[in-house]
UniProtKB/Swiss-Prot annotation:
Its cofactor is Mg(2+). It comes from Caulobacter vibrioides (strain ATCC 19089 / CIP 103742 / CB 15). Keywords: Cytoplasm, DNA damage, DNA repair, DNA replication, DNA-binding, DNA-directed DNA polymerase, Magnesium, Metal-binding, Mutator protein, Nucleotidyltransferase, Transferase. The keyword Metal-binding applies. CDD domains: PolY_Pol_IV_kappa. HAMAP family: DNApol_IV. The lineage of its organism: Bacteria, Pseudomonadati, Pseudomonadota, Alphaproteobacteria, Caulobacterales. Monomer. It is found in: Cytoplasm. It catalyses: DNA(n) + a 2'-deoxyribonucleoside 5'-triphosphate = DNA(n+1) + diphosphate. This is DNA polymerase IV.
Length: 403
């Protein structure tokens, strides 16, 4: 890429494939913090952290706070050590959902092929829309950026590429207010010197595993023997090899944005003891978490469902600071929700679920806090053992307690 031949702007570049690229990734810039700053101008030049409690984690840090080292999923006590002057605001997800709806309303006018990843990001397929809009995808997206900032008061960054993987990377190259493109011709050379954790799904454990066999850059993976990768990472190794060559066959699928994953069970006899209810709850959490891992998503909201003998349904929800795809976290939250219910009530059904998903594969393992990461590693290993030797191959202590 080179500077724009028309104006030579340092932030404007010319790209030979710009007129033909049609897969985009759009990401709001520090979304939650930006909404709060827009609504309270006195916060504009201050470091803002969205999160709750010293024992919680950072949900979002504004760019000023990030300059001090604060970042998403970091424990709050650590973030406040790095940025002691930060203004801490508890997340207001109802407000953020409304702003997300306004943004997606504008996206819907461009194309029906939109795959939301979370409240603040989405993949967009603009293939074949040139005649409809009288403009290339790049032109439409540039207009969309300006319109969102003008009408909603928030900024977004856009990545344009031939596939979802490259579009996601491109959107992160020039934040905030960024617009970057990665073409097919340059993809492999662009990726070659990047660290392996730029690839989706590569967290600290995979980085260490790859380093043990001398693979530290994306170029190393691209040049690696397929058998070596398969022996080390199984089918995941083959996937990383394709990505290292800039290849990604996934389509932008609006239907992939599943609304909820849940499991429930009805008792033969009504249960009222808290311990009995928890014993029934654990395998449901395992089932939900396993399904989330299989689909490559993590839920931001945990739900508990209860039905009383008179068939009244009680649903409780809690928004998590960090998305989860582990039974450990889902069970912990569902149990806390259950403990808030009046003791002594009888129930004929209990259920657990996750909703408001983010793409865990795209975000990578580093999106999770340390405890969540350890639980994820453990539960993924259990998945593999059960898949090979049967469901009874590994029985957890909680499951044994319920027997």
């Amino acid at each position: 890429m080179a500077r724009c031949p028309a104006c030579a702007s340092p932030r404007t570049v010319f790209h030979e494939e710009l007129g033909t690229l049609s897969i985009a990734h759009m990401d709001c810039d520090a979304f939650y913090a930006s909404v709060e700053k827009r609504d309270d101008p006195s916060l504009r030049d201050l470091p803002v952290i969205i999160g709750g409690g010293k024992r919680g984690v950072v949900t979002t840090a504004c760019y000023i706070a990030r300059m001090s080292g604060a970042k998403s999923a970091m424990p709050m006590f650590k973030a406040l050590k790095l940025c002691p002057d930060a203004v801490v605001i508890k997340p207001n997800f109802a407000k953020y959902k409304e702003e997300s709806r306004r943004i997606h309303e504008k996206l819907d006018r461009l194309t029906p092929l939109i795959q939301p990843l979370s409240l603040d990001e989405a993949w967009i397929d603009l293939t074949g829309t040139e005649r409809l809009h009288g403009a290339t995808p790049a032109q439409m997206l540039a207009r969309l950026q300006a319109e969102i900032e003008r009408d909603i008061g928030l900024t977004v960054s856009v990545g344009l590429a031939p596939n979802k993987f490259l579009a996601k990377i491109a959107s992160e190259l020039d934040k905030p207010r960024g617009f970057s493109a990665i073409g097919a011709a340059e993809a492999q050379s662009f990726l070659a010197n990047k660290p392996v954790n730029i690839l989706p799904g590569v967290g600290p454990a995979t980085v260490a595993s790859l380093a043990e066999i001398g693979l530290r850059t994306v170029g190393d993976i691209a040049a690696a023997d397929l058998k070596l990768l398969a022996n080390r990472l199984g089918s995941g190794g083959m996937r990383l090899h394709r990505l290292a060559h800039g290849q990604d066959s996934r389509i932008v699928d609006p239907d992939q944005a599943r609304k909820t994953i849940s499991a429930e069970t009805t008792f033969n006899d009504d249960l009222h003891k808290r311990e009995d209810l928890e014993d029934e709850l654990w395998p449901l959490c395992e089932k939900v978490a396993k399904q989330a891992r299989q689909e490559g998503v993590a839920g931001r909201v945990a739900t508990l469902k209860l039905r009383t003998p008179d068939f009244k349904i009680h649903t409780r929800r809690r928004t998590l600071a960090v998305p989860t795809q582990t039974a450990r976290t889902l069970f912990q939250v569902a149990r806390e929700l259950l403990s808030a219910e009046p003791r002594g009530l009888a129930y004929r059904l209990i259920g657990a679920g996750l909703t408001e998903f983010v793409d865990a594969d795209t975000a990578g393992a580093d999106m999770f806090a340390d405890e969540e990461r350890r639980a994820l590693k453990s539960e993924t290993a259990i998945d593999a053992l059960r898949g090979k030797f049967g469901a009874a191959a590994v029985v957890t202590g909680r499951a044994l307690k319920g027997r």
